[in-house]
Amino acid sequence: MSFPKELEKVLEITKAQNVWRRTQTLNLIASENVMSPLAESVYMSDFMSRYAEGKPYKRYYQGTKYTDEIETLAMDLMNEITNSKDCDLRPTSGTIANAAVFRVLAEPGDKALIAPVQAGAHVSHTKFGTLGALGIQHIEMPFDEQNINVDVDKAIKMIEEVKPKFVVLGGSLYLFPHPTKELAPHVHAVGAKLVYDAAHVYGLIEGKVWSSPLKEGADIMTVSTHKTFPGPQGGAIFSDGSEVFKQVSRTIFPWFVSNHHLHRLPATAVTAIEMKYFGESYANQITRNSKALAEALAERGFKVIGENLGYTKSHQVAVDVRQFGGGNKIAKLLEDANIIVNKNLLPYDKPENVSDPSGLRIGVQEMTRYGMKESEMEEIAELFKKVIIDKKDVNKVKKEVIDMRKNFLEVKYTFDDMKDLEKYSSKSLKLII
């Protein structure tokens, strides 16, 4: 019997996606990354068919003995590389992690202070997202335009006046660290808790190029496991022994998660091991690449945000493209050339301009994992110039992009040869490999 046409279409689309994004494009979305072949090999397993409500060794289902083992191991590994005491891997995304924390810390009608939207606050921090869905009032802290950050002095005054239930730092357009250690004492002085959303920078934190918010006074840290930390899509929550963590961990199930997508756990554990051995070199190369790309774009006539601050300290670069037609137009134009970025609000944009903002947000973490370094950032900047400034034929630029990618198809910062792992692995892992 031949395949049904519908099945052929599913397989055709999946193959096309794999070929296009894995081999032909420059993937510069700041919230994406790629797992290693080893992590992918354990991602598809029997765990993906199973349920395990509750915590390890305290389940509501039978048949979870290996789930308990892998979840405990994964949490231990994540705590080790994070230098933290507590980890919960059950949130299925960073936004779910935020929701679980916010709900424990406040009731509907309570107030929360967040980093200004201009300083990169994620939508889940706002009335338009998770906070709004929970009925919690969001109040933006004052913005320091010069430093593209929270205005510390004015924020301290606001904390003292508002006395919020909690304060949120961290963001999605996130070029420079928010002032955790400067604000933490003042947050705690009014009886509030400090939440740090490290979704974008978690890989930089465990790679030791970005300060640990837990060591600077944050009570709890939420993360994504698939941005600068190159694991499977999911979320996690960390603390250094805070009571808040215990409360959140008790309520993740049943409030926000029933089954927590168990196939993530082996892949998260593998990625944590990779980052234990390669995370620092990976994070260092990410930040070198982002700065190199920012400088190369500026040299070619682009208005790169944050020039007075060195452009960036994270994996991200932000570019104002208003003079070329705006973020929406330029992001689509770049995609035609197989360069994948996203349009993004810039600090001086109004929220209502979200559909056609001034800027582009660029992330270098995925192409860094494919082995690109500073010289390739120069090449990428030149490709941007050809498309946007020189108005070259996008099909010709696309061919250049595809040719460039031919040299960067293997994931780095992992164990070089999966066959070499057989001498270290159990028989069961050999079967998977």
From Swiss-Prot:
Its EC number is 2.1.2.-. Its cofactor is pyridoxal 5'-phosphate. It holds the Pfam family SHMT. Pathway: Amino-acid biosynthesis; glycine biosynthesis; glycine from L-serine: step 1/1. It is found in: Cytoplasm. Its main location: cytoplasm. SUPFAM superfamilies: PLP-dependent transferases (SSF53383). Homodimer. This is Serine hydroxymethyltransferase. It comes from Saccharolobus islandicus (strain M.16.4 / Kamchatka #3).
